UniProtKB/Swiss-Prot annotation:
It is a multi-pass membrane protein. Coiled coil: none annotated. It is found in: Mitochondrion membrane. The gene is Sfxn3. The lineage of its organism: Eukaryota, Metazoa, Chordata, Craniata, Vertebrata. This is Sideroflexin-3.
Length: 321
């Protein structure tokens, strides 16, 4: 037995999730791209530390910081419900490098229709992999649901991009640079509700403050999905709004006119810089364990809760990612 006590709750994040700062610190750790560089041996070592600690066995000499580091490495690579290792590009730590590359290319190759359609398709394919890799173990995504969401989101993104591209032909060049963002925003509004359509049909679990399940609510599901859509669009705003303005200015300068090949890597770099901060900060906009007032729930569920526990005014639910 080591010196580390067994009362550290590694089932929950390390930092206070009721504050924005605590949530931001949590997601900066979860989305850390450096976790992608860890070897299979290092991942297995972290898994052993976490599983042993949960079983009451402490690795000799283990410190609290090392335990939390192992917990976040474990969470970054293994599915929380199934325990399976998540495919590399489906991990949360892959969000920044993958989105940096895809978004940078969407913003660089937006002028020609074939390349614009190609990169919108690549983006939605990546989103499908992420959504499937991080699917809920309690409410798994079926292949049919995944396929419907994938086709619908890709169609919506491409249709939005093509429609706006034709509308912006006679507008200033800067306006045309924002077409990819509009397409991504439209796709998120289609993709996320479709991926979580089962929740919109049967609801998501709502609990009291102690975590005791009180029932299922479609209203809570709608609120959670709305929060996720806002967060996803918010993540895209800095990366898809700031670089176009900067690049529109730089491309008029002699430096880039003489070196046009620098445009793509420069754009990807700018997008990456924005995403390093935007991804964790927008994930932290809303608490993972969100709340909703009992009076806003469906009449049947509201009556059930008020009959069983009349003192409860607020219930809680997991909003998802």
């Amino acid at each position: 037995m080591g010196d580390l006590p067994l009362n550290i709750n590694i089932q929950e994040p390390r930092w206070d999730q009721s504050t924005f700062l605590g949530r931001a610190r949590h997601f900066f750790t979860v989305t850390d791209p450096r976790n992608l560089l860890l070897s299979g041996k290092q991942l297995e070592a972290s898994r052993n530390i976490v599983q042993n600690y949960r079983a009451g066995v402490v690795t000799p000499g283990l410190t609290e910081d090392q335990l939390w580091r192992a917990k976040y490495v474990y969470d970054s690579a293994f599915h929380p419900d199934t325990g399976e290792k998540v495919v590399l590009i489906g991990r949360m730590s892959a969000q920044v490098p993958m989105n940096m590359t895809i978004t940078g290319c969407m913003l660089t190759f937006y002028r020609k229709t074939p390349t614009m359609v190609f990169w919108q398709w690549v983006n939605q394919s990546f989103n499908a992999i992420v959504n499937y890799s991080n699917r809920s173990g309690d409410a798994p995504i079926t292949v049919q649901q995944l396929g419907t969401a994938y086709v619908s989101a890709t169609t919506g993104a491409v249709a939005t991009a093509l429609g706006l591209k034709s509308l912006t032909k006679h507008l200033p060049p800067l306006v045309g640079r924002f077409v990819p963002f509009a397409a991504v925003a439209a796709a998120n509004c289609i993709n996320i509700p479709l991926m979580r359509q089962r929740e919109l049909q049967v609801g998501i679990p709502v609990t009291d403050e102690a975590g005791q399940r009180l029932g299922h609510s479609v209203t809570a599901a709608k609120q959670g999905i709305f929060q996720v859509v806002v967060s996803r669009i918010g993540m895209a705003i800095p990366a898809m709004a700031i670089p176009p303005v900067i690049m529109n200015t730089l491309e008029k300068k002699d430096f880039l006119k003489r070196r046009p090949w620098l445009g793509a890597p420069l754009q990807v770099g700018l997008v990456g810089f924005c995403l390093v901060f935007a991804t964790p900060l927008c994930c932290a906009l809303f608490p993972q364990r969100s709340s909703i007032h009992v009076t806003r729930l469906e009449p049947e569920l509201r009556a059930q809760i008020q009959a069983q526990k009349p003192s409860i005014d607020v219930v809680y639910y997991n909003k998802g990612l």
